[in-house]
Design a protein with these regions (language model features):
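Structural signature of multi-pass alpha-helical membrane transport proteins
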Residues: 2-3, 10, 14-69, 77, ...
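Juxtamembrane and boundary regions of transmembrane helices in multi-pass small-molecule transporters
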Residues: 3-5, 9, 112-127, 166-211, ...
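Hydrophobic alpha-helical transmembrane segments
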Residues: 20-25, 46, 50, 74, ...
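Alpha-helical membrane-inserting segments
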Residues: 29-33, 37, 51, 55, ...
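Interfacial helix-loop-helix linkers and transmembrane-helix boundary segments
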Residues: 37-43, 61-71, 86-104, 244-247, ...
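Transmembrane helix-loop junctions at the membrane interface of multipass transporters and ion channels
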Residues: 61-65, 89-90, 122-124, 142-165, ...
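Entry/N-cap segments of selected transmembrane alpha helices
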Residues: 90-117, 171, 305-333, 382-384
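Alpha-helical membrane segments and immediately flanking helix-loop junctions
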Residues: 119, 123-172, 340-385
Length: 402
């Protein structure tokens, strides 16, 4: 930790200092690039990921243990904020269209698994390798961990490393692929954003916070309930759920806090413990943005070198990953739009939630008008079930390879 790894103009930085510096540079440059629009379209905060990959590919030495902690903590902050923002209206929205959206999520997962198996057979690829590409294409780190544990239990030589390589090569373009899927859905269905309903804006304006609520103190944010939610969420996410396979399924560090935050956001407002000024205040919004920025920077800085190395030897995995990423959500959301007539902002959130992909939700929130929570609702409605299914199917692909 005390070894000096990086210097600028005779200033030397330890690996910890280098890591923090690279995180700051990744976020700073990524946010600047995110303001660039081409024909009104921008990748937004997703640029942070690619700046991080670029810096890592240049050989900047970061502390990977530190990156892992920062990445996970950023993700926890992000999903906690999303859960609090969506919570007050989540269960009402779930009753309206939650069942249909979760069935869509189930179909989306099944299509992804089916395409993965077909590619493995047609391209003569090992299914264990494709399981790694699958987890990267759906941006699901817990699924990768579950698959690695499964191959470890089965004693498959070298499979864990190949799983990680497949994940690393598919993940970066998966983030872009899901955003492109959102744009293609808009193009296919000729959606005019100016005419797209944003019901949540009106409902929020008619549901103002009570002035004497405890949440109005200190700028509308109380840290105590937030960290209680995080603590309870981590406990919930660590509870093993037996499903009759080699390893139990867990909601993980993202799924657990999200579920607890949803309940806390709904129950807290309903019981009058705090108002929507707390759950949707500037403090929670900033928590969400800081969380996603830390997460993307951590992922990029940690994956850059592995991404470049794997692309050089397994470049077709990139193509396979893009197919697994984009085909299922495009087909499912076209059905959701053309048959079920679901809102476009909700469907963008659905794409992110059904792939457990926070950057897609960040993009959707950037596209949606200020005050519209439909992307958050679509994301949170399908995320818990999707997380379970993604972890389960990652292990299933490994077991199918035996």
């Amino acid at each position: 930790m005390d070894n000096y790894q990086f210097s600028i103009l005779n200033f030397q930085f330890s690996t910890v200092g280098t890591t923090v510096l690279m995180l700051a540079i990744s976020i700073f440059l990524g946010l600047l690039l995110g303001k660039i629009k081409i024909k009104g379209i921008t990748l937004g905060i997703t640029w942070v990921l690619f700046v991080g990959i670029g810096l890592s590919a240049l050989g900047v030495a970061c502390n990977h243990d530190m990156l892992h902690i920062i990445k996970e903590f950023g993700l926890i902050l992000f999903v906690t904020a999303v859960g609090l923002q969506v919570g007050p209206g989540f269960f009402r929205s779930f009753k309206k269209g939650g069942l249909a959206m979760n069935i869509m999520a189930l179909v989306n997962v099944a299509l992804g698994v089916g395409i993965t198996v077909i590619i493995a057979k047609m391209a003569n690829q090992e299914l264990t390798d494709m399981a790694g590409v699958y987890t990267g294409a759906i941006t699901n780190t817990p699924g990768l961990s579950a698959a690695q544990q499964a191959v470890g239990d089965l004693g498959i030589e070298g499979a864990s490393e190949r799983l990680a390589a497949g994940y690393a090569v598919a993940y970066p373009l998966a983030v872009v692929g899901m955003i492109v899927s959102c744009l293609l859905l808009r193009w296919f269905c000729r959606i005019d954003l100016k005419k797209e309903p944003t019901e949540e804006i009106q409902s929020n304006q008619n549901n103002q916070s009570t002035p004497n609520s405890t949440s109005s103190k200190k700028g509308g944010i109380l840290l105590i309930p937030i960290f209680i939610i995080i603590a309870l969420g981590i406990v919930l996410g660590s509870i093993p759920i037996p499903v009759g396979m080699k390893a139990p399924v867990k909601l993980g560090l993202a799924g657990g806090p999200l579920v607890v935050a949803l309940i806390a956001g709904w129950l807290g407002v309903k019981k009058g413990w705090y108002s929507t000024e707390f759950t949707d205040g500037q403090g929670v919004h900033m928590l969400r943005e800081v969380g996603i920025a830390l997460f993307l920077a951590g992922v990029g800085l940690g994956a850059g070198q592995a991404f470049v190395a794997t692309v050089q030897t397994h470049y077709m995995w990139v193509v396979y990953g893009v197919i697994i990423t984009m085909v299922p959500p495009i087909l499912v959301t076209l059905f959701g739009r053309l048959v079920l007539h679901l809102n476009y902002y909700t469907l963008m959130g659905f794409i992110g939630g059904s792939h457990t992909d926070p950057p897609t939700l960040a993009f959707a929130n950037n596209v949606a008008p200020e005050g519209c929570k439909l992307p958050n609702t679509g994301y949170a409605t399908v995320y818990p079930l999707t997380m379970f299914l993604r972890i389960f199917t990652a292990q299933l692909l490994v077991l199918m390879a035996i």
